[in-house]
Regions:
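Short coil/turn connectors at secondary-structure junctions
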Residues: 10-11, 101-103, 136-140, 269-270
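ATP-binding/phosphotransfer module of carbohydrate and carboxylate kinases, centering on a glycine-rich
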Residues: 2-65, 183-336
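Short amphipathic alpha-helical segments
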Residues: 27-28, 56, 82-84, 119-120, ...
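ATP-dependent carbohydrate kinase catalytic cores
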Residues: 104-135, 228-244, 251
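Short beta-strand-loop/turn "lid" adjacent to the catalytic site in phosphate-handling enzymes
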Residues: 60-107, 112, 116-125, 142, ...
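Short, acidic Gly/Pro/Ser/Thr-rich loop/turn segments
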Residues: 23, 76-78, 148-152, 208, ...
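Active-site nucleophile and cofactor-binding loops and adjacent substrate-binding regions
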Residues: 43-45, 86-87, 106-113, 132-135, ...
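Glycine-rich phosphate-binding loop of actin/hexokinase-like ATP-binding domains
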Residues: 128-132, 136-198, 284, 291-297, ...
Length: 336
C-alpha cells in the first residue's frame, strides 16, 4: 500500500543506521542544507537474518523503491565485504545494491555517520557539559557507548568544509588506573583473552563491570555463577539511588569513559568532544556529578589543554540517520 504522505515528486533516498541491536531506517529528502527525515523506524536485528532482509521489510512497509541509499553500519568498512562487529551479519556492498535495486549505495561506519551529523545539530539536540561555550571548533572527537564503543574524527578545512575520518578507536586496549579497574580487567581478561575499552564502555560493558565488582565483593555468593544484570536495569537502579552496587557500577563506567575520552581528545588534537550512543543520554545528570570530568582532565601536564576542550552529549534521537543523509547530500553535491 502506498503512503499518501510521501510526495512522489521528492527524490527520497533510503538511509540506515545498523548497530548490533537495532536496524534503524528512514526516508530522507537531502535537498535542504539539513536533510529532512521521514518515516523513521527501528527494527530489532535479532528478528532478521540479514541487512538485506531488514531493509526489504522496511521498504515494503512503505511501498517505496529508492534509487539511492546511504547506510551506516557498526563495522570497519574497508572493502566490498562488510562484517558487523557485534552481530552475525555480513554482506557484499555490490550484491546488496543489486538486491535492493539501487543506482548507488554508500556504506559508512556508524560513528562516521554520527560525526557527519554534528555540524547539522541544533543547540537543542546537544547538551553542554564542560569547557568553553563557543561555536563548533575542529577537530571534533565523536565517541560513544551503545552496543559497542564507536569513535570518529570530524575535521573542517580552510574552505569551511567538513570531512570525517572513521576509526576503530573503541578497540584500543583498556588501561586500568585503580585497583578496582585492575580487578575488572582481570575478570575480563579471563573471559575474553584481551580487554579493549569497548569491553567496558558499551551496554554489555555495564553488565561486565557490575558482575566483576559483585564477584569481588561477595565471592562466595557468585562462585560458579555469572548471571549478568541487564544494562538498562543497572542504570535504572543506579538512578533510583537505592542500589549501592548499581551506583558503584555506573560511577566506574563514567570514570572509565572520562579517561578514554581524554585520551581520544589528546590523540585527535580535539577542540570539541561529542559523546553519542544510546546509553549516556539516559543519565546526563549522573555523568555530570560523576568522576568523568576529573578523569577526563587527569592527563598530567595537559590539564590546561583539555580544560579548553568543549564537551557535549548528543541528544538527537537518531544522529546516525541524520549523518547518513548529510553524507549522501555531500556526495551528491560533489558530483554535481
Amino acid at each position: 500500500m502506498s503512503n499518501p504522505n510521501i510526495d512522489p515528486n521528492t527524490d527520497w533516498v533510503l538511509v540506515g543506521d545498523i548497530g548490533g541491536t537495532n536496524a534503524r531506517f528512514a526516508l530522507a529528502d537531502i535537498r535542504p542544507a539539513r536533510p529532512i527525515l521521514y518515516a523513521e523506524q527501528s527494527l530489532p536485528t535479532s528478528d532478521y537474518a540479514s541487512l538485506q532482509h531488514a531493509a526489504e521489510t522496511y521498504l515494503a512497509q512503505h511501498a517505496f523503491k529508492p534509487k539511492r541509499a546511504a547506510i551506516a553500519v557498526a563495522a570497519a568498512v574497508t572493502g566490498d565485504a562488510v562484517q558487523l562487529t557485534n552481530r552475525a551479519w555480513s554482506f557484499s556492498q555490490i550484491e546488496l545494491q543489486t538486491a535492493l535495486g539501487l543506482e548507488s549505495l554508500t556504506i559508512l561506519n556508524d560513528f562516521g555517520a554520527v560525526a557527519y551529523a554534528v555540524p547539522a545539530l541544533d543547540d537543542s539536540e546537544r547538551e553542554y557539559l564542560y569547557g568553553p561555550q563557543r561555536a563548533l571548533q575542529s577537530p571534533v572527537t565523536v565517541l560513544g557507548p551503545g552496543t559497542g564503543l564507536g569513535m570518529a574524527i570530524l575535521l573542517q578545512d580552510s574552505a569551511q568544509q567538513w570531512s570525517v575520518q572513521e576509526t576503530e578507536g573503541g578497540h584500543v586496549s583498556f588501561a586500568p588506573l585503580s585497583e578496582e579497574e585492575q580487578l575488572i580487567a582481570r575478570w575480563l581478561n579471563a573471559r575474553f583473552g584481551r580487554t579493549s575499552n569497548e569491553r567496558l564502555l558499551c551496554g554489555a560493558g555495564l553488565s561486565h563491570i557490575d558482575a566483576a565488582l559483585a564477584g569481588a565483593e561477595h565471592p562466595s555468593l557468585h562462585a560458579g555463577s555469572e548471571t549478568l544484570r541487564e544494562p538498562s536495569k543497572i542504570v535504572q537502579l543506579a538512578l533510583d539511588g537505592h542500589d549501592i552496587s548499581a551506583r558503584r557500577t555506573l560511577a566506574r563506567f563514567c570514570a572509565v569513559l572520562g579517561s578514554v575520552a581524554g585520551d581520544a581528545a589528546l590523540i585527535h588534537g580535539a577542540r570539541t568532544l561529542m559523546i553519542a550512543g544510546g546509553i549516556v543520554p539516559r543519565f546526563i545528570p549522573f555523568l555530570k556529578s560523576s568522576g568523568f570530568r576529573e578523569r577526563f582532565l587527569s592527563k598530567g601536564r595537559f590539564v590546561a589543554y583539555l580544560e579548553n576542550v568543549a564537551v557535549y552529549v548528543i541528544t538527537h534521537p537518531n544522529p546516525g540517520l541524520l549523518g547518513a543523509s548529510v553524507c549522501l547530500r555531500a556526495e551528491s553535491n560533489a558530483i554535481t
